[in-house]
Swiss-Prot record:
GO terms for molecular function: acetylcholine receptor inhibitor activity; ion channel regulator activity; toxin activity. Belongs to the conotoxin A superfamily. It comes from Conus bandanus (Banded marble cone). This is Alpha-conotoxin BnIA. Residues 52-54 are annotated as: Ser-Xaa-Pro motif, crucial for potent interaction with nAChR.
Length: 65
C-alpha cells in the first residue's frame, strides 16, 4: 500500500469516527433531556405529596408556601 493510500485510509477512519461520535453525542442529549424532565416531574410529585400532608407542610414551609 502506498503512502497516499494509507493517508486516505487514515482520513476516512478519522471522518467516520467523528461522524459516529457526533451522532452519539446528539442522541445522548435527547436522553439527558428526557431524564431531566422525568426527574423534575418526580420532584414535583414528591413536593405535591408533601404539601398535602399537614405535618410535612408545616416542616417545609419554604417548599409548600
Amino acid at each position: 500500500m502506498g503512502m497516499r493510500m494509507m493517508f486516505t485510509m487514515f482520513l476516512l477512519v478519522v471522518l467516520a469516527t467523528t461522524v459516529v461520535s457526533f451522532a452519539s453525542d446528539r442522541a445522548s442529549d435527547g436522553r439527558n433531556a428526557a431524564a431531566k424532565d422525568k426527574a423534575s416531574d418526580l420532584v414535583a410529585l414528591t413536593v405535591k405529596g408533601c404539601c398535602s400532608h399537614p405535618a410535612c407542610s408545616v416542616n417545609n414551609p419554604d417548599i409548600c408556601g
